[in-house]
Amino acid sequence: MRTYKAKYFLSMFFCLFISATLSSAQEKIKINFDNKASIKDWEFIDEAPKNLGDAGPSTWEIKKGPLDGNSLFQGSNIWGSKADTCLMGTFAIYKAEKFKEFTIEMDVFAADNDGMGITWAYESTKKHYRVIMINDGWPEVPVDKIKGPFMKIQKRVSDDKPWYELITAEKGITYKEQAPLHWKFEVKGGEFKLTREDNKIIKGADKEYEEGYIGIQLYAQQGHFDNIVIENTWAVDPRKKVSTTWAQIKKDHN
């Protein structure tokens, strides 16, 4: 009887360990925008009218473009703030899942020199982080005193001026217009890192906002986005999962 019980527990422990290890590895989410159905998990959100100079609205759609067949395209010139002192406009938010720690990669094609970037920990227009870049020497009178060109990491704190808190900025950095670009963005332990195809990097850190949605933000920019790959890197330690479940099994068989 003891031999049987020992074999049973050993077998169960092995199965639990394999199951927990496999479940801790996350499958990558791949979004290629092949057809209109591929945007069913996306929500398109414009800033409140009080924060817009060009009210748009935004025109997000699936359209054939310069990247890889069809892509997600935004063709309007929607921008804010109303006095044009802060880069604002429109969001494309992936609403199928929230993320805490993750890696996202995407191909990008910018039609002009205006603002574009990634948003994360998104809960609303007034609560999220963003990394944003612009080639133009704009805003002319920036609310945070930093004119373009730049890359910035910022935290949205309200729907009123100054809108964002600055986390970090890299001045004088531009991107290629009318050319394929690639972004890789990572969030881990409250630290953020964007790496571009030209090896330009910006890093920052903040832990106030944790979990939320991921998306794209544009300011007066017409652009294509495609071949998005998201990997959820937040996982329960499999050793803790096995330990908890193992304790419950022993309790049930005593």
Give, region by region, the residue ranges found by the protein language model:
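Extracellular glycan-recognition surfaces and repeat-rich motifs
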Residues: 40-80
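Bacterial N-terminal signal peptides that target proteins for export
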Residues: 2-10
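Secretory/extracellular carbohydrate-interaction modules
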Residues: 80-158
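Short, aromatic/His-centered strand-loop micro-motif at the edge of beta-sheets
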Residues: 159-182
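Extracellular carbohydrate-recognition regions
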Residues: 25-51, 238-250
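Flexible glycan-contacting loops in extracellular carbohydrate-active proteins
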Residues: 204-229
